[in-house]
A protein has these predicted regions:
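Acidic/His-rich, divalent-metal-binding segments that scaffold phosphate/diphosphate chemistry
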Residues: 1-78
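Generic short alpha-helical segment signal, independent of protein family or function
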Residues: 55, 64, 90-100
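Acidic/histidine metal-binding catalytic segments
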Residues: 38-52, 98-122
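An active-site-proximal "capping" alpha-helix that borders the catalytic cofactor pocket
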Residues: 26-32, 83-97
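Single conserved hydrophobic/aromatic residue that forms the stacking wall/gate
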Residues: 123-132
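Histidine-centered divalent metal-coordination motifs
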Residues: 23, 57, 84, 122-123
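Short coil/turn segments at secondary-structure boundaries
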Residues: 75-83, 107
Length: 132
């Protein structure tokens, strides 16, 4: 199954729908571009944490309930959805996080976890930015 990040734009075709992988890759690339210009304001560890947050911030969208909301071809029994921010935040354990960023400590993991979770809350609380 191919997972998507957002629904098809109004009047758009299914070919315009962005896959979840492409969205996450684009987000990482955007952060890397930002760091090319402004990276001197951040430590290497801070940059690594931000890149990792970008890499996983929407992984919680890879669930059948969310996908059925943005893909009407999927037929799922109506059920309460766990917000994708909760799921995204839980995709990376402290151990896996420290494998990606060996110099990270527990406080860094807490900041990362909070950032991933809150990135999703921004989407939930701003309905004009939601596309599903």
């Amino acid at each position: 199954m191919e997972y998507f990040a957002k629904s098809v734009p109004n009047g758009g075709s299914k070919e315009e729908q962005v896959t979840l992988k492409q969205h996450l890759d684009d987000t990482v690339e955007c952060a890397q571009d930002f760091f090319e210009k402004f990276g001197h304001y951040f430590t290497e560890k801070e940059k690594a944490i931000i890149i990792e947050a970008c890499r996983v911030h929407d992984l919680g969208k890879a669930n059948i309930v969310f996908q059925s909301k943005i893909n009407k071809e999927l037929h799922v029994i109506k059920t309460q959805e766990i917000p994708h921010g909760f799921l995204s935040a839980m995709t990376t354990s402290p151990e896996e996080f420290k494998n990606h960023i060996p110099e990270a400590d527990n406080d860094d993991y807490k900041a990362f976890y909070t950032a991933v979770y809150h990135l999703s809350l921004i989407h939930i609380s701003e309905p004009t930015r939601r596309s599903y």
